[in-house]
Regions:
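Blade-edge beta-strand/turn elements of extracellular beta-propeller
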Residues: 183-193
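Structural signature of eukaryotic scaffold interfaces centered on beta-propeller domains
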Residues: 12-13, 85-94, 145-155, 200-211
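Long, hydrophobic/aromatic-enriched structural stretches that serve as scaffold segments
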Residues: 67-110
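Intrinsically disordered, low-complexity linker/loop segments enriched in Gly/Pro
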Residues: 79, 104-156, 161-171, 175
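N-terminal leader/transition segments
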Residues: 1-75, 97
Length: 232
């Protein structure tokens, strides 16, 4: 049995206690994003991916609430075909001062996710939106920056990381950093696809910034000694 002791002095400033989740209605393989998202599997053995996603979604909401996280669920609808709507962090970002970022999306069916009703819902839930910075017009120039999929934000130290790809434009990233007062860190990352090395489509696929809790396991000898009765 493992016994964990958590230091209450740990800074949890990289985490949030309130999140937005979009409950999917058309979740599944997305033809429009598959050309550079090589993690998708068109031949998945899951017969009803949307039903499976909804069940997993509902379980996650319950688990988060049971652990003290405030979850604000917005129900997607069938008016538009949005198979990736469960990932709202790609088109919107929220910031502690009330600023909101809206981002240009690579796939046309993902642009449909960028709905004012979502922000109106959050305001009805008591959130204050003081300023919206909208980068979505860059879609007309085929420039994209898909929110905190493209960028990893170190909110405590005001550093932003971005791995350049079709969905993560360097100029837009620098513009975001200037607008939101982050120091940019730009790099490239790759994955093997067949015999090719191709850019990883989203930075958050390969890195994150979070609070790290480290458990140090005693050596086998120490564990044995702890179970041995003491002798004179």
């Amino acid at each position: 049995m493992l016994n964990f002791t958590f230091d209450k002095r740990i800074n949890m400033g990289q985490a949030t206690n309130s999140i937005l989740m979009i409950r999917p209605i058309n979740f599944g393989y997305n033809e429009e994003t598959a050309d550079d998202n090589h993690y998708q599997n068109k031949d998945s053995i899951i017969k009803n991916p949307n039903e499976t996603a909804q069940n997993e979604f509902d379980n996650m909401v319950n688990n988060l609430k049971q652990n003290g996280i405030s979850v604000h669920v917005f129900q997607d609808d069938e008016n538009d075909y949005t198979p990736d709507s469960i990932f709202p962090n790609n088109w919107v970002s929220f910031h502690q001062n009330g600023d909101v970022g809206l981002f240009p999306m690579y796939a046309k069916n993902r642009r449909l996710e960028r709905r004012p009703e979502v922000l109106e819902f959050l305001e009805s839930e008591g959130f204050t939106i003081s300023n919206i910075v909208d980068y979505s017009s860059a879609e007309s120039e085929n420039k994209f920056l898909e929110g905190t999929g493209s960028m990893i934000l170190d909110r405590e130290n005001r550093i932003a990381y971005c791995s350049i790809s079709n969905r993560s434009n360097e100029d837009l990233f620098i513009e975001f950093c200037e607008d939101f007062e982050f120091t940019p860190v730009i790099f490239n990352s790759f994955q093997s696809v067949g015999d090719k090395r191709l850019p990883i489509y989203h930075t958050n696929v390969m890195m994150c910034v979070a609070t790290c809790l480290l458990y140090t396991s005693p050596s086998p000898r120490d564990r044995t000694r702890s179970r041995m009765p003491s002798s004179a």
